[in-house]
Design a protein with these regions (language model features):
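C-terminal all-alpha effector/ligand-binding and dimerization domain
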Residues: 82-140
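Short linear motifs at protein or domain termini
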Residues: 1-44, 128-140
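Amphipathic, well-ordered alpha-helical segments in soluble domains
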Residues: 8-11, 33, 37, 54, ...
Length: 140
């Protein structure tokens, strides 16, 4: 039931299930939606707020400030399913990325969209790399 809720499996009319077809484009769209919600959350943070702790704690902190429950639930699903998978695949922790994005956003930097895109691409690459290792295929 949890995997179905997360969109990882699809229940068929005969009550059987099959794995969802998670293409690179689908994963890209999911991460873009998560990034959009996290950018919205960054703007909702109090000016003196800081993002501390490990990378996943920082993501979870952002989720708590979203005012609309549906947005919080969507972001929770994206964070706990896809982002957590990518973060756990890192060879070493990266705990400064979200605080840097927050700083750029607060400064009104024109580099914010490119910085978010770079972060999304990094997460996507981690997901695709691990997925290809499980499937026994190569990824670029």
């Amino acid at each position: 039931m949890i995997l179905e809720y997360q969109g990882l499996i699809i229940r068929l009319p005969n009550n059987r299930i099959k794995a969802a077809d998670l293409t690179e484009e689908t994963l890209r769209q999911i991460l873009a939606l998560g990034a959009q919600l996290e950018r919205q959350a960054m703007r909702a943070l109090p000016q003196d707020a800081m993002l501390a702790g490990g990378e996943m704690l920082q993501h979870r902190t952002l989720r708590t400030v979203l005012p609309y429950p549906l947005h919080r639930k969507l972001l929770e699903s994206i964070q706990e399913t896809y982002i957590a998978f990518a973060v756990s695949a890192r060879p070493a922790p990266v705990n400064d990325r979200l605080p840097r994005l927050l700083m750029l956003d607060r400064q009104g930097s024109p580099d914010v969209p490119d910085a978010w895109n770079t972060y999304e691409e990094e997460l996507l690459h981690l997901i695709l790399t691990i997925r290809s290792q499980y499937a026994g295929t190569e990824t670029h």
